[in-house]
């Protein structure tokens, strides 16, 4: 996972397990955790590809229930303005 701080590694690994089991093909960390600005109170920003759209909110609920730290989940396949901007401008660290 590159430069991800150890305090986040356990939660990111757990999120990766949940996402993979749901069929997600790729996962990236972005934001403060990815660029080294995170603090103990930071959330984890995850960007994903390949998750069937009908599973997005189910998986988001599982992440919220099983990981104590707040998670923001962005679907890079949804074609939204934000996901396009994220792919163009944001540094992302690949998880899987």
Spell out what each predicted region is:
Residues 1-28, 34-40, 51-96:
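Catalytic core of pol beta-like nucleotidyltransferases
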Residues 42-44:
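Periplasmic OmpA-like peptidoglycan-binding domain that tethers envelope proteins to the cell wall
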């Amino acid at each position: 996972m590159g430069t991800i701080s150890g305090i986040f590694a356990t939660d990111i690994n757990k999120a990766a397990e949940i996402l993979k089991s749901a069929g997600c093909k790729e996962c990236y960390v972005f934001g403060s955790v990815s660029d080294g600005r995170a603090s103990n109170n930071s959330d984890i920003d995850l960007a994903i590809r390949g998750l069937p759209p009908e599973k997005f909110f189910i998986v988001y609920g599982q992440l919220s229930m099983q990981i104590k730290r707040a998670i923001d989940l962005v679907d890079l396949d949804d074609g939204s303005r934000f996901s396009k901007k994220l792919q163009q401008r944001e540094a992302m660290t690949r998880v899987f």
